Amino acid sequence: MAAKDVRFSEDARHRMMHGVNVLADAVRVTLGPRGRNVVLEKSFGAPTITKDGVSVAKEIELKDRFENMGAQMVKEVASQTSDVAGDGTTTATVLAQSILREGMKAVAAGMNPMDLKRGVDKAVVAAVEELKKLSKPCEDSKAIGQVGTISANAEESVGKIIAEAMDKVGKEGVITVEEGSGLDNELEVVEGMQFDRGYLSPYFITDQQSMAADLDDPYILIHDKKISNIRDLLPVLESVAKAGKPLLVISEDVEGEALATLVVNTIRGIVKVCAVKAPGFGDRRKAMLEDIAVLTGGTVISEEVGLSLDKVTLDDLGRAKKITVNKENTTIVDGAGSADDIKARVEQVRIQIEEATSDYDKEKLQERVAKLAGGVAVIKVGAATEMEMKEKKARVEDALHATRAAVEEGVVPGGGVALIRALLGIKDLKGANHDQDVGINIARRAMEEPLRQIVNNSGEEASVIVNQIKGGEGNYGYNAATGEFGDMIAMGILDPTKVSRTALQNAASVAGLMITTEAMIAEAPKDEEASPGGAPGMGGGMGGMGGMGDMGMM
């Protein structure tokens, strides 16, 4: 086991604080509409220029292991806030640095770190309650657009396109962000249910121009196993041919003579058929087949529920107004399932979302809800260069995340004003002892810090503006972009409540842990192990040889 370097109390905290300051000072300059740029070196190609706090934080690794531990803990605050709320990374970093800086001073003055932490935690709980009171629901597309614009560093086109996407697919619909091929951002909306499986044979194509199979008012056979024997399919094919409608076959696979017969029937015009593989894998496939069955009013033909292919009637098949199948995707528009059944299925999936523990599972379940509820929107990000594309795509994803947070928990006035107003909640707050009171004051001071930083970045005098805003009430604040005072919400400067809340809670949590740190352990640096003088390793070897000679002499 490698040797360890151990540092205690003041020395440990001092080193950790130095690391925090390096990271936080690099991140805080990006805060606000007049935030400065940070240039990041890349191992190949041109450097990246960004105003995104979390991108700056991710780049920072310090040489000193103890300082690096401090930096990594604050980096965790930023990424945690970004994961939960989509924005607020820089705010969280500024808050954590302020709580930690003031907390370290208090600990150095002989105060009890545990009581300081209790005081800070008490203040944060009260401030969060006040934030919730300030919060207003974010329902109209104008407010949604404003939140998106601010999160995307004041880029109006991003806010606009996110608001438009939410209008099209609903607030809970799936909105994905992809790299586009043009210079401008584009919005593409897929109505109905779409899954990523295309036709099994190009002979199913009905429209040569679009290379797709279009089925109008078709029947849909949903089966969970492979189909290779045509005898199983014949009764269904005959019934569908008599009804004079097309047929879509969704199953694990269709192969051999079964596929050949379907192709021949289609080419001869006896019955128009298209076959696709079932979407997903394993349990997810079962669930998605059930979703399709509910959406189209059909039944999943499965031996598990005692149904076999040769016993299928037209009543077991689903229906839809139109189905389009291309090489990669199948889109079912206007399924014939009953609205009540679809609603019940959506509720069922929502319960699973609440119980899901992994982000991946949650994302997949949300996609299922959106497909059942009717639509997926794709924002295609346009840019002139690949470097700009990556930066822009990250900003659009953040803005989308923040907008969802705003819809979920509402909005508060932006520009650091919400945290100033939340100070009302801790105005008369008292701790159990003097040290806890100091902790409450540390939180109070930290909550002013984001506003101070926004003002500093815009080149104005922070203390004057902070005092002026404290003298106002409600949404009254300072617009750093224009240098005007006024109603922040009327000026379109909003923050999602979830962003302000998460930033404050995460910052206090990590800063509290760091204040109460009494020892730090890291691997000892390798270069200290080499003995001094001569080439590394030579001295030790030679000494050993000398010793051997002495022993021989005796």
From Swiss-Prot:
Major subcellular location class: cytoplasm
Endpoints of the signal sequence: none
Disulphide-bridged cysteine pairs: none
GO terms under cellular component: cytoplasm
Keywords, comma-separated and alphabetical: ATP-binding, Chaperone, Cytoplasm, Isomerase, Nucleotide-binding
Gene3D superfamilies assigned: GroEL, GroEL-like equatorial domain, TCP-1-like chaperonin intermediate domain
Catalytic activity reported: ATP + H2O + a folded polypeptide = ADP + phosphate + an unfolded polypeptide
E.C. code: 5.6.1.7
Statement: the UniProt record of this protein carries the keyword ATP-binding: yes
CDD domains tied to this protein: GroEL (cd03344)
Compartmental location: Cytoplasm
Sites where the protein binds ATP: 30-33, 51, 87-91, 415, 479-481, 495
Gene Ontology MF: a single term: isomerase activity
Pfam families cross-referenced by the UniProt entry: Cpn60_TCP1
Function per UniProt: Together with its co-chaperonin GroES, plays an essential role in assisting protein folding. The GroEL-GroES system forms a nano-cage that allows encapsulation of the non-native substrate proteins and provides a physical environment optimized to promote and accelerate protein folding.
Subunit structure: Forms a cylinder of 14 subunits composed of two heptameric rings stacked back-to-back. Interacts with the co-chaperonin GroES.
Protein name (record): Chaperonin GroEL
Organism: Nitrosococcus oceani (strain ATCC 19707 / BCRC 17464 / JCM 30415 / NCIMB 11848 / C-107)
Gene this chain is encoded by: groEL
